[in-house]
């Protein structure tokens, strides 16, 4: 398929929204975020799961926005911790979502559309699925961005199930202190090519995705300005169901164990980021690559999804393998 701008995903819900956003004159960043929010409305587990956003443009280098889950426990003392033979409650494995914070920062960096205009894709999907609680959460995100997650309408049902009273670590302070989001992309030199990727992206791996993250998905886009963007997110099928919000939180946080140093509160928790942007010898981005469902890109073979752009003709071509 040949054009001047394209978007694609292994998730049909996300792909439809991303293509629609580009068709309305949107940017590559807006397209991939629209796809993410559509998925967040269509599936209960996406909004509270990890997100990686990668952006690269001509003459601007690459940026990575860290929407990985954060370890909870800000503003509290270290708990005593669980003993080796002690049952660990599900609440102790619930982490702090940072996807919306990362999306807001990436969208501000792009500056093309308001975040609310992108979130509307998710609201429509949630309403179509009959998930009224999820539609309400996304409605508040549309109005307030990350601040919506510090409002009582969100924190009260979340903390009721994942707070200290249930053996969890999450506190109100966790939702007000999502930091360290914007990073310069790192460069990996492989087979005479430079690939821009997130600093936390893994090297080639044959290991399966962590079971708690469920299905891996990506959205890729290239716009008429020559900006390349990609997001990697997840659709967990198992986790803590927060019925009042129609959301599912995956079991990713690290429980504190007695006698073992605890995971620092507020620190990002590992998550795969199988997306990269390849540059030519002049440092110009020419291809966005993605390997949905994998822990990392396999740089030795063609990616499952890719969009390439000829810097001279500006023609854009997509590939599915």
Language model features with spans:
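Active-site rim segments in enzyme catalytic domains, especially the processed small/beta chain
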Residues: 41-56, 215-288
